[in-house]
């Protein structure tokens, strides 16, 4: 039997790193439309875009998406997601996948994977994905979030800093990654149960989440387990910087 889940795509116009990001044109379409189209190719029963901006609302309606306006004062995309699921009236055990609005090349198969990951791990409140890192530049890039998991696949922590810090190896040479250390980049897509989202919002942000600007740290701070799997197909590139945008444009306009 196929898994029933809903995809929500948070889309904010006021991105701090790349203003106007969801509406930036790529191959004749706004970026958020590419994300929506990829999500529609997954096994999701419903795909909803959540925004706090009228221009995004109008653009999404123009290409036929289901889109909801939310409050503008949310601390994170997950807080925005909680408002959406409350509006949709989903039951507490329903699975919702949060697909970031800056992943226009997100493979539909990994949207299905993260939903199945959560369904297979009832001990976890959240499921997410990662991919191996092989380049030192990525380890030291603050836009590439690193994740370290325990032997059971549960996240120990996430950070924009190089994690783990290879003390002896990096003291000698930071241009080579030490052998035997499984560096992993977090892929910013999550599956939640609706009941967890209600708890998440009630907690409010913690100092660690605010320091790193990583909303998943709020869950770890409160003792919630996050199960992490390596993606069976990794996205080519997310869009965090103007350079990322140009790379994606070259790929989709080729």
Curated annotation (Swiss-Prot):
Sorted alphabetically, the keyword list is: Cytoplasm, Lipopolysaccharide biosynthesis, Nucleotidyltransferase, Transferase
Q: What class of enzyme is it?
A: transferase
Any one GO biological process: lipopolysaccharide biosynthetic process
Provide the catalytic activity annotation.
3-deoxy-alpha-D-manno-oct-2-ulosonate + CTP = CMP-3-deoxy-beta-D-manno-octulosonate + diphosphate
- InterPro entries in the record: Cytidylyl_trans, KdsB, Nucleotide-diphossugar_trans
Protein localization: Cytoplasm
An example Pfam family from this entry, by short name, is CTP_transf_3
Does this UniProt record's set of keywords contain Transferase?
yes
For this protein, the Enzyme Commission number is 2.7.7.38
This entry carries the following GO cellular component terms, namely:
cytosol
Give GO MF terms, alphabetically: 3-deoxy-manno-octulosonate cytidylyltransferase activity
| Matches recorded under NCBIfam families | kdsB, PRK05450.1-3, PRK05450.1-5, PRK13368.1
Described by its record, this protein's role is as follows: Activates KDO (a required 8-carbon sugar) for incorporation into bacterial lipopolysaccharide in Gram-negative bacteria.
Q: What is this protein called?
A: 3-deoxy-manno-octulosonate cytidylyltransferase
The gene it comes from is kdsB
